Swiss-Prot record:
Residues engaged in binding Mg(2+): E25, D27, D85
Record keywords: Cytolysis, Dermonecrotic toxin, Disulfide bond, Glycoprotein, Hemolysis, Lipid degradation, Lipid metabolism, Lyase, Magnesium, Metal-binding, Secreted, Toxin
Protein name stated in the entry: Dermonecrotic toxin LarSicTox-alphaIB1aii
Organism phylogeny: Eukaryota, Metazoa, Ecdysozoa, Arthropoda, Chelicerata
Family according to the record: Belongs to the arthropod phospholipase D family. Class II subfamily.
Active site: H5, H41 (nucleophile)
Reaction(s) this enzyme catalyzes, per UniProt: an N-(acyl)-sphingosylphosphocholine = an N-(acyl)-sphingosyl-1,3-cyclic phosphate + choline; an N-(acyl)-sphingosylphosphoethanolamine = an N-(acyl)-sphingosyl-1,3-cyclic phosphate + ethanolamine; a 1-acyl-sn-glycero-3-phosphocholine = a 1-acyl-sn-glycero-2,3-cyclic phosphate + choline; a 1-acyl-sn-glycero-3-phosphoethanolamine = a 1-acyl-sn-glycero-2,3-cyclic phosphate + ethanolamine
Amino acid sequence: WIMGHMVNAIAQIDEFVNLGANSIETDVSFDSSANPEYTYHGVPCDCGRTCTKWEHFNEFLKGLRKATTPGDSKYHEKLVLVVFDLKTGSLYDNQASDAGKKLAKSLLQNYWNNGNNGGRAYIVLSIPNLAHYKLIAGFKEALTSEGHPELMDKVGYDFSGNDDIGDVANAYKKAGVTGHVWQSDGITNCLLRGLDRVRKAVANRDSSNGYINKVYYWTVDKRQSTRDALDAGVDGIMTNYPDVVADVLNESAYKAKFRIASYDDNPWETFKN
């Protein structure tokens, strides 16, 4: 999965997919009542990027729905996965469940079109703080009470705080999650980070009793760091330059081993060689 980083304006969806992304990451900020409010990152952000592009969250969802609904004039067949980077740092821990409920209702109405031919992309809820694990139960509860528990089949999870792998496993246990797990590891492109924790995550993914289904690394903008991540065995690379990652995947060393995921590739299934 080539994951376009910080896609917060509707116009950027086309831009990143046209550069080669089959997945995008979008920032979600919350108001003081735990309502998802804007797709907005803010300053500071990655080096070489504008940090302040934004939409109202529900408007972004409508644009995203068009981009992922077959038959729509804005449809991109290639765009199959969306990571919502949930900026829950502004919330109290006891608001996490409410944030999950409100997020689910927004998605149900504006993205899934109340279950009636909505957007088809798989969704990853990326949570920065292990203490906010109740967001997951709140999300599930709202979809169930609104009569659409089946949409949970399209939803996966990520804890993005670079926590110890054992602590992450424990948070999922508390959240009652037993699958659909993406594990992120990374740092802003302004700084360097080694691949030690990525290798631990990949080892967990490939073990018989691990909790991880997929591993992605962020934010990778250079050819050499792309190669290093692929050599470590990641499933996804988040990047500001999807064309760079696409170019590396076309190199003979990687062409035989990797391909770009399509809609038919289940993002919740661990890939077995």
